[in-house]
Amino acid sequence: DVIVLDPPPAMGFLGLNVMAAATGLLIPVPARQLDYLSTIHFMETIADNIEILEENGTPVDYGFIRVVCSAYTPSKPGEADMWKMMQATYANFLLSQPILASEEIKNATQAFRSIYESKPSAAHATYQRCRDNLDAVFGEVLQQIREQWPSQSISKRASDTVASVAA
């Protein structure tokens, strides 16, 4: 089973419990300077908290830690530069595909739905472009998860699985 927990970045009891229970971390970082700097601080806090957990008898062994650039608009001034900086900083920890900013995602969120549960709010091509982008990102995440499960075939197409989950 895959359970996704999305605690706030503050490291209170909820955040510590999520860190103790997790077998993998996916850290979203918008391609903006303040978010980038906040994430660096957050990573330092994660390292400190892992040390505290291990000192208190809770071993922490993440199968993967990945960073995903989120809400990315390549045409916005500075965001393309932040994407390049993230690639240099996070290197192999950064997913190769960023989550592109999209009105489709905003509209789905306002309706308390995922994009996979929503009908297109704009042109079908815009909706499909958003879905294709998310399928590519989630395919990378699924690959990371499958690599932790020796019983699962890594060769299975991620988009097939994402599509079946959405259905």
Regions found by a protein language model. Name each.
Residues 2-94:
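Conserved catalytic-core segment of NTP-binding enzymes
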Residues 56-167:
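C-terminal lobe/tail of nucleotide-utilizing enzymes
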